[in-house]
Swiss-Prot record:
This is Large ribosomal subunit protein uL22. GO terms for biological process: translation. The keyword rRNA-binding applies. Part of the 50S ribosomal subunit. PROSITE patterns: RIBOSOMAL_L22. HAMAP family: Ribosomal_uL22_B. Belongs to the universal ribosomal protein uL22 family. It comes from Microcystis aeruginosa (strain NIES-843 / IAM M-2473). GO terms for cellular component: cytosolic large ribosomal subunit. CDD domains: Ribosomal_L22 (cd00336). This protein binds specifically to 23S rRNA; its binding is stimulated by other ribosomal proteins, e.g. L4, L17, and L20. It is important during the early stages of 50S assembly. It makes multiple contacts with different domains of the 23S rRNA in the assembled 50S subunit and ribosome. The globular domain of the protein is located near the polypeptide exit tunnel on the outside of the subunit, while an extended beta-hairpin is found that lines the wall of the exit tunnel in the center of the 70S ribosome. Keywords: Ribonucleoprotein, Ribosomal protein, RNA-binding, rRNA-binding. The keyword Ribonucleoprotein applies.
Amino acid sequence: MTIDTSNEVKAIARYIRMSPLKVRRVLDQIRGRSYREALIILEFMPYRACDPILKVLRSAVANAEHNEGLDPATLVVSQAFADGGPTLKRFRPRAQGRAYQIRKPTCHITVAVAPSNKD
């Protein structure tokens, strides 16, 4: 099975309030899988990162179907990655006038799908 990357279609979710490290753990499981397999994996994994990834995957497939006229049954996850976004910085008051910084990470999730050529 080869992947035709000339017809690659992608979707991006930006500023997701989640650590990119935790999102990558899930993305590694669906990269290279068919759309059908990826859906099943994401539905049953117990991680919080699965919901936004599932949303981005469905958006990428909808883009492929609507914009390129591709059949969802032939689509494979060709690329899946999470880049770090801006970090929200907050402060927690501590004793004697001190304050500790709290970092709330965000990430940008990109999922690309492409049709597979079955040899």
